[in-house]
């Protein structure tokens, strides 16, 4: 999938995450989380699974997590990717 424009999904409320994606020359992830020490690796794995599913190679993702569950993170990343691919 080609990232065509910037897109945002989510909120900064408790148990949610805010995902912002922008076009980039390489794949980058900027993750901030209130539970980074405990679940940072799992969050990164979850995000990477969605990126692999959509075959994203060139994008920069900014994710600010407030304790979101994996299913919420997946949904937010997927929605941001779809929005970034719209014309």
UniProtKB/Swiss-Prot annotation:
The organism that produces this protein has a lineage beginning with: Bacteria, Pseudomonadati, Spirochaetota, Spirochaetia, Spirochaetales
The function of this protein is: Covalent carrier of the coenzyme of citrate lyase.
Matching entries from InterPro entries are given as: CitD (IPR006495), Mal_deCO2ase/Cit_lyase_ACP (IPR023439)
- Quaternary structure and partners: Oligomer with a subunit composition of (alpha,beta,gamma)6.
Q: What is this protein called?
A: Citrate lyase acyl carrier protein
| Intracellular or extracellular location(s) | Cytoplasm
Q: Which Pfam families match?
A: ACP
Q: Which UniProt keywords apply?
A: Cytoplasm, Phosphoprotein
GO CC annotation terms, alphabetical: cytoplasm
On this chain, the residues bearing O-(phosphoribosyl dephospho-coenzyme A)serine are 14
HAMAP family of this UniProt entry?
CitD
Family listed = Belongs to the CitD family.
Q: Does the keyword Cytoplasm apply?
A: yes
Tell me if Cytoplasm is a UniProt keyword of this record: yes
Name the principal localization, coarsely classed: cytoplasm
